[in-house]
């Protein structure tokens, strides 16, 4: 017998191949598998015998393709094919080697899969192609690499009814990104599953807690989908509506999770599953061991002292995402995690702010702090001697600590290093990060104490805890972010006054501007001025905290795109800034006059003037410390990357970001190739970028959650949310109605149009250029003192922040009303 139905076949990889054996197991245990049959491994042996072929024959692949079926073999196979076709419009033909999908050798993508097979001729041809794939060069090479020695060609074939999947994807019963046994991960998109499996689409991602079935989800672009055509498979573009919504409902995700748990229980080890959904029915198309997870975990995600362990998960850890966006690269984590912990602990001893940070660690590439509540509130006089001079205090530290070190870094970036000098400079940089973040918090914490003091006075006088108006009384104060914007606006004024420059900016895309400007004398002079501007204001990157992204100094594209935006929208910076300043003065004078007690009025005014004088600290310290330190470090570290690339440690200097500090130090003195490790970590880093990290870990008390929200904003979704109402933190007052535009990163800035409501995870100073066009601002993370809140108040537009779910629940084109005074978002109509 050469062919046998799934439900009748023996669970033997030697007869059915590994893929076939798994489908037989699933079918016999009642899991939802489309009907099919196995062409057993003895069929290939018979075919080779009939055609006088041996495994050692020259061009055995070609011999199989040109070979002929004996009548006996052909009749049996085609009879099974026609019986299956009675129930299905077409079939899928897949290779099923005895070696494939077994532990230690997944052979993923090494063999063949053919979809939408309808005729006998196609069927027999694809059977031969599957057999031939066993002898292909790429498979032989892979088997050699995996130390897989097969004595005889044990290649079976799976023939399965083709499900015309409306949605499909892959499930990992153990999270392959974090290796967390408590979670499963689903990648899904529209149409047939080949688009997801082959990596041709950016799928939706669902992470499911296997106990509580709590779902975290990240929407993917889902650029295309595949479907059965008259012949073969057709690839089509997804519609805007399809892209903007999740392809699976929560109910479907939970049902998939339940089936996955049953499958995992059946095997007794982690599995991955390919699935399809048609007519509301879930089908399992394949299941196999997750063969590389332990090796990947060992090779690519070594547990370091600053990574959260399983034991750590018993404590309460707060995601620091409102301050540090997204996952951080391995090298940057080596610098920033120890620096944050050191700086927080040292500074909190001097300036207690009501919370204690015990540790700072990494989870899924994201930075978390272990917070401890219950600290004694600061004394009345804590930091008071600095209150009148906070801004001056900051600039004294910047001038005496940071700027001299930056000049040293600039020199080091121009130096041709030996391994020894590079190592010495690298270690100096690591040590400076500790100093830098101690001083960072020495600047920030006294300002927090002062602002909290003034806010408490304000609330005592008002008799309420409404915050938006309080912070609007602190707007209209120039800072480095606004100063940068004003310089860019002045460039736009120059463009508008010069017809030749104006033509370039009006008629070209942002990425074309530099090339066009370089073609004329006026353009070259303009670029020269832009480059001079960048030497002062360009020490910032697309990603606010990391070394991994280009900085403005390296590429004038970012500045030119911002200038073009000002040219396009006709925004007048000075006029708008003056309006904000006048609004602030009016608000404050009205409030001050409402205080009847002269002594209280005088005391409030004194604290207010101190607070207003220090209102630039949030952005100025970011400009000189957070952004500039990482930018200067990047330029220097690229020299280290060049040295390692020359010595064969890595292929490209920017692979450096995917090594840890100790590996860099060892490789400088004892070069060995770390390229494979760097590539694996780069892949994992990008997976972290796509996944949604939890807002917190552990099981916090209500008091811990409350304390956390006072620091970073909302950490859980508001329980008042309904289908058409979302609540968040009221961060900038006013009401506005407009269409939603979800922006996920800087690459999408050009899609934002004047009058849109900006919806995003969070903002950094790079995003400031969008505020001049925005009707309102909505974020998933952040609180009343976040960048988005401060800049929204400066631009006088409503902002609701810390919604946790806005980027998931809203879609491009939805018409919404944003009430920045109450923190309420209302969906007026769906797109």
Curated annotation (Swiss-Prot):
Keyword Protease: no
Keywords per UniProt: Transferase
The keyword rRNA processing belongs to this UniProt entry's keyword annotation: no
Classification via InterPro entries: ATP_grasp_subdomain_1 (IPR013815), PEP-util_enz_mobile_dom (IPR008279), PEP_Utilizing_Enz (IPR051549), Phosphohistidine_dom_sf (IPR036637), PPDK_AMP/ATP-bd (IPR002192)
GO MF annotation: an example: ATP binding
Protein name, as recorded: Uncharacterized phosphotransferase YvkC
Cross-referenced PANTHER family: PHOSPHOENOLPYRUVATE SYNTHASE-RELATED, PPDK_N DOMAIN-CONTAINING PROTEIN
Organism from which the protein derives: Bacillus subtilis (strain 168)
Pfam family, one: PEP-utilizers
Signal peptide feature range: none
Family: Belongs to the PEP-utilizing enzyme family.
């Amino acid at each position: 017998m050469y062919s046998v139905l799934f439900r009748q076949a023996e669970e033997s990889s030697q007869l059915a191949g590994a893929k076939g054996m798994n489908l037989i197991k699933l079918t016999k245990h009642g899991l939802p598998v489309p009907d099919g049959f196995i062409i057993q491994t003895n069929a290939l042996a018979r075919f080779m015998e009939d055609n006088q072929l041996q495994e050692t024959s020259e061009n055995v692949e070609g011999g199989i393709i040109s070979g002929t079926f004996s009548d006996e073999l052909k009749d049996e196979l085609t009879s099974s094919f026609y019986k299956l076709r009675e129930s299905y419009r077409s079939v899928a033909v897949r290779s099923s080697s005895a070696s494939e999908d077994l532990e230690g050798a997944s052979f993923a993508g090494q063999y063949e899969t053919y979809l939408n097979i309808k005729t006998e001729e196609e069927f027999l041809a694809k059977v031969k192609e599957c057999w031939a794939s066993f002898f292909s060069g790429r498979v032989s090479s892979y088997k050699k690499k995996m130390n897989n020695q097969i004595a005889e060609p044990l290649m079976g074939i799976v023939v399965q009814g083709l499900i015309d999947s409306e949605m499909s994807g892959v499930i990992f019963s153990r999270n392959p990104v974090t290796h967390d046994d408590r979670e499963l991960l689903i990648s899904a998109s529209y149409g047939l599953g080949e688009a997801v499996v082959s990596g041709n689409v950016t799928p939706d991602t669902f992470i499911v807690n296997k106990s509580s079935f709590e779902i975290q989800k990240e929407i993917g672009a889902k650029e295309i989908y595949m479907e059965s055509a008259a012949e073969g498979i057709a690839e089509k573009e997804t519609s805007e509506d399809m892209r903007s919504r999740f392809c699976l409902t929560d109910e479907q995700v939970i049902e998939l999770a339940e089936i996955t748990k049953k499958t995992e229980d059946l095997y007794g080890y982690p599995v991955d599953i390919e699935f399809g959904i048609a007519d509301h029915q879930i089908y399992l198309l394949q299941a196999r061991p997750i063969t590389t997870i332990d090796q990947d975990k060992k090779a690519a995600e070594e547990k370091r002292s600053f990574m959260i362990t399983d034991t750590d998960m018993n404590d309460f850890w707060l995601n620091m995402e409102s301050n540090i966006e997204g996952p951080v690269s391995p090298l940057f984590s080596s610098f920033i995690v120890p620096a944050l912990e050191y700086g927080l602990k040292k500074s909190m001893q001097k300036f207690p702010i009501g919370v204690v940070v015990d540790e700072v660690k990494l989870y899924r590439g994201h930075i978390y702090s272990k917070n401890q509540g219950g600290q004694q509130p600061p004394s009345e006089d804590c930091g008071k001697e600095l209150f009148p001079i906070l801004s001056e205090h900051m600039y004294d530290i910047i001038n005496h600590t940071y700027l001299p070190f930056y000049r040293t870094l600039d020199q080091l970036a121009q130096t041709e290093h030996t391994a020894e000098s590079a190592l010495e400079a690298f270690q100096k940089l690591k040590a400076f990060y500790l100093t830098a973040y101690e001083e960072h918090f020495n600047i920030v914490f006294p300002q927090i104490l002062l602002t909290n003091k003034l806010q408490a006075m304000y609330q005592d006088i008002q008799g309420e805890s409404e915050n938006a108006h309080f912070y609007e009384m602190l707007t209209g104060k120039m800072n480095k972010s606004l100063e940068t914007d004003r310089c860019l606006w002045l460039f736009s004024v120059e463009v508008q006054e010069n017809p030749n420059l104006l033509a370039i900016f009006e008629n070209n895309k942002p990425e074309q501007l530099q090339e066009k400007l370089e073609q004329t004398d006026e353009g070259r002079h303009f670029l020269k001025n832009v480059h001079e501007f960048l030497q002062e204001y360009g020490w910032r990157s697309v990603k606010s905290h990391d070394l991994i992204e280009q900085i403005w100094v390296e590429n004038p594209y970012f500045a030119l795109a911002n200038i073009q935006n000002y040219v396009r929208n006709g925004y007048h910076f000075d006029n708008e800034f003056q309006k904000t300043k006048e609004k602030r003065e009016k608000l404050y004078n009205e409030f001050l006059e409402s205080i009847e007690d002269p002594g209280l009025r005088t005391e409030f005014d004194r604290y207010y003037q101190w607070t207003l004088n220090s209102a630039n600290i949030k952005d100025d310290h970011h400009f000189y410390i957070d952004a500039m330190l990482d930018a200067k470090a990047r330029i220097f570290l690229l020299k280290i990357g060049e040295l390692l690339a020359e010595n064969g440690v890595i292929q490209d200097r920017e692979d450096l970001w995917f090594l840890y500090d100790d590996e860099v130090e060892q490789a400088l003195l004892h070069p060995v190739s770390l390229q494979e490790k760097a590539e694996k970590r780069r892949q994992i880093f990008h997976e972290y970028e796509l996944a949604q990290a939890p807002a917190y870990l552990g099981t916090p008390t209500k008091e811990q959650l409350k304390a956390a929200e006072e620091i970073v904003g909302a950490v859980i979704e508001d329980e008042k949310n309904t289908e058409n109402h979302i609540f968040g933190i009221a961060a900038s007052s006013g009401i506005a109605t407009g269409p939603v535009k979800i922006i996920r990163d800087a690459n999408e800035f050009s899609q934002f149009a004047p009058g849109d409501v900006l919806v995003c995870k969070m903002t950094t100073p790079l995003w400031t250029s969008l505020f001049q066009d925005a009707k309102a601002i909505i974020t998933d993370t952040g609180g009343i003192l976040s960048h988005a809140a401060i800049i929204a108040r400066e631009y006088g537009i409503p902002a609701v922040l810390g919604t946790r779910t806005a980027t998931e629940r809203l879609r491009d084109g939805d018409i919404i009303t944003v009430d920045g005074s109450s923190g309420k978002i209302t969906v007026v109509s769906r797109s």
